[in-house]
Amino acid sequence: RVAWLAACHIPELAACAIFYGGRVKIPLGGGHPAPIELAGKIQCPVIGFFGNEDRNPTPEDVDDYSRALSAAGVRHEFFRYDGAGHAFQNFPTPERYNEAASEDAWEKVLAFLTRELG
């Protein structure tokens, strides 16, 4: 959610990478809208990585994220990993770490950042 919010509020960002990205559909409190409602403010391309076993965000939440970005005309690409849950790159936590998903996501995010940032 932090990466999503940064992309919404920092127009100078050239790229946004989201890993796991939960709570995007939940209002921030204090009368502020849910981050998903701010998708139209995102001006940079977005890449996202999600585990299909994650409960926050669920695969259905990720579908909603993609629809919101598409409706806002935001170029984005999401990757999902079977057998991976939340924080699948957290190698110090063996019950979360998914080596195959982690390595694939890392290669993809590096390629994305190289392409977008030059």
What are these regions (language model features)?
Residues 70-118:
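C-terminal catalytic histidine-bearing segment of alpha/beta-hydrolase fold enzymes
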